[in-house]
A protein has these predicted regions:
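General small-molecule cofactor/ligand-binding pocket signal
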Residues: 34-36, 82-86, 140-142
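Short, hinge-like loop/turn segments at secondary-structure boundaries
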Residues: 50-54, 99-102
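A short helix-to-beta-strand connector/capping loop
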Residues: 75-82, 137
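Charged docking surfaces used in two-component/phosphorelay signaling
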Residues: 85-93
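Small/aliphatic-rich secondary-structure junction motif
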Residues: 3-49, 134-135, 154
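Gly/Ser-rich helix-loop-strand patches that form or flank binding pockets
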Residues: 100-155
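A generic structural signal for well-ordered alpha-helical segments
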Residues: 26, 73-74, 130-132
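A short acidic, glycine-rich active-site loop
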Residues: 52-64
Length: 155
């Protein structure tokens, strides 16, 4: 099986740098991109019908987003990406996905720029180490402000 590069699809401005880098690395190494979208846990809706409708809408929006971004990943990597949707917190979802798929070999995150700091996922990985899903997993942290040309050169 080809090695897989895991990218967490979030709404941060630097996310696209991580996706571009992972896609180019996958192409240059014969690998594949895994795109993980994490949905928030059950909402505070008081009725189960409302909760179910909110969850259905969130999942539908995630599928549309993954399909749109997946086209870009496929164009850059040359292989169809794997789409995953999990519910809960991002760190827990990453651990679950990595534990379930031994072909995931690298986690690719993009660091935020400016006064915001590197971002919550990058900060958590730095603080707790790369022991993810019961195994050590290399983490590539891509500067969020890299240009397309710089990513091409590095990947």
């Amino acid at each position: 099986m080809p090695r897989k590069f895991l990218v967490v699809v979030d709404d941060s401005p630097e996310f696209e740098a991580a996706l571009r880098f992972a896609s180019r690395r996958a192409k240059s190494t014969g690998g594949r991109v895994v795109m993980l979208r994490v949905l928030p846990s059950d909402s505070d809706a008081h009725w189960s019908g409302a909760r179910e409708e909110i969850a259905r809408q969130q999942r539908q929006e995630a599928e549309v987003l993954l399909n749109r971004l997946g086209e870009e990943a496929m164009a850059r990597s040359g292989a169809a990406p794997v789409f995953l949707i999990e519910q809960g917190d991002a760190q827990g979802a990453i651990r679950k996905v990595v534990a379930a798929d031994p072909d995931i070999k690298i986690l690719v995150l993009a660091a935020g720029t400016g006064s915001r700091g590197p971002g919550p996922l990058v900060s958590a990985i730095i603080k707790h180490g790369a022991q993810i899903g019961g195994r050590k997993l290399p983490v590539t942290i891509v500067p969020g402000e890299l240009t397309e040309e710089e990513i091409e050169d590095l990947a």
